[in-house]
Structure formats: C-alpha cells, structure tokens
C-alpha cells in the first residue's frame, strides 16, 4: 500500500508541480539561496519544491549538503544533512518560502541569501564558496572557533565535490577567512558573492 501511495504522490507531483524556469527567462527573477535541514524522508526534496513554488519562488536546482550548525536551543554544534535550494522569484519570496518550510518541517531555523550587487543599500552579507574542504576537518575547526560559532552560526560542505559554503555578515570577513584556512581550504581559490542574509526562525 505504501509503495502505491508513494507512486501516486510522485505521479501527481509530476503533473501539478510547476516546472522551474531558467532564471534568464523571468522578468522579475530575483536569484537567492535557501538552506534547510534535509530530513530522512525520500520525498522531502519534492515536497519542499512544491512548498517553495506555492510561496512565490521557483526552484532551479538543489544540492545535498553535510551541515554543521550552532543551535541556540541546544547550545552546541549540530551535525546534520541539509540541502541548498537555488531560488528564482520576486523580491521577498525567499523569506515567505523559508518561513513556510520552517513551519511545515518543524525546523529551528532556515537560512536565506538573496543576491545583490556589491555596495547595494540592503547588502549585509557575503556567500563564500571554497573548493576541496573535508567535512570532518570543517566540523572540528568550527567547534574550536567561538567567534565562528557566534557570528557565522554554521556552514556546509557539498556531498558531491567537497565544496565549502559559508554565509557571513560583511563585518565578519576576517572570521570567515580564518575558518576557511582552519578547515584546510584556500582563500585564494574561494569565490565570493554579495547579498542579504536572513535567519528565519
């Protein structure tokens, strides 16, 4: 019976879920990233895609991550599987989608990052992508760095190619640079983009 129900959900999800359009083809496309805990349900990604679409944004892709986060509720670092969703939608849609996901899946916090031009009035953060970082080394470096725990609150490494992803406030560049080095990454090889971050909790 369960296999039949799963098949029906996949079938109807494929029929009714909107197709994620290319960013360049949408006049009001505002690119953003959304980071959420990925639970063990194999339908999580599909359900999240639908929820995001129902709240004003389209998912143009997603990446599985190994995440390390600082939990205010538990007052300790937490290691968990997560997923980065690439979004395209109207300005403000990332917040609405993040809040809906947080409530639907009972998550403590969902992080969003909206891309903006450097020096834009609303810019308050950067997203750093550094290649070839081991998740275990990053976890140890993060746990040993109080400033990183308090200021950055976490980070992720892609499960496919070991790429470190950090979202930091613009005033925390030195903290991020130090953490990348402590985790074994190369700051010179890192790519940086500018934008606005929000912890939706």
Regions found by a protein language model. Give the residues of each.
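Poly-acidic low-complexity segments
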Residues: 134-136, 170, 186
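Short glycine/threonine-rich beta-strand-turn micro-motifs
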Residues: 58-131, 147-178, 199
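Substrate-binding cleft of extracellular glycoside hydrolase catalytic domains
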Residues: 132-147
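C-terminal region of N-terminal signal peptides and the immediate post-cleavage residues
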Residues: 2-32
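N-terminal low-complexity, Pro/Thr/Ser-rich intrinsically disordered segments
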Residues: 22-57, 61
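Extracellularly exposed regions in secreted/surface proteins, prominently low-complexity, repeat-rich
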Residues: 173-201
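Enriched - but not universal
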Residues: 10-11, 73, 190
């Amino acid at each position: 019976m369960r296999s039949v129900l799963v098949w029906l959900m996949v079938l109807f999800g494929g029929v009714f879920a909107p197709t994620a359009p290319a960013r360049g083809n949408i006049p009001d496309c505002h690119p953003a990233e959304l980071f959420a805990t990925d639970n063990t349900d194999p339908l999580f990604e599909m359900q999240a895609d639908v929820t995001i679409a129902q709240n004003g944004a389209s998912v143009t892709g997603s990446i599985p991550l190994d995440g390390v986060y600082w939990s205010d509720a538990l007052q300790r670092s937490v290691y968990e599987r997560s997923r980065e969703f690439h979004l395209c939608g109207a300005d403000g849609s990332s917040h609405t989608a993040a809040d809906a996901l947080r409530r639907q899946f009972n998550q403590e916090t969902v992080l969003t990052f909206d891309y903006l031009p450097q020096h834009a009035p609303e810019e308050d953060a950067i997203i750093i992508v550094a290649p070839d970082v081991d998740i275990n080394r990053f976890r140890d470096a993060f746990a040993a760095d109080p400033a990183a725990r308090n200021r950055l609150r976490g980070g992720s490494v892609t499960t496919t190619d070991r790429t470190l992803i950090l979202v930091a406030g613009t005033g925390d560049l030195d903290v991020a640079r130090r953490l990348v080095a402590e985790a074994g990454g190369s700051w010179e090889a890192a790519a940086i983009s500018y934008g606005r971050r929000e912890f939706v909790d």
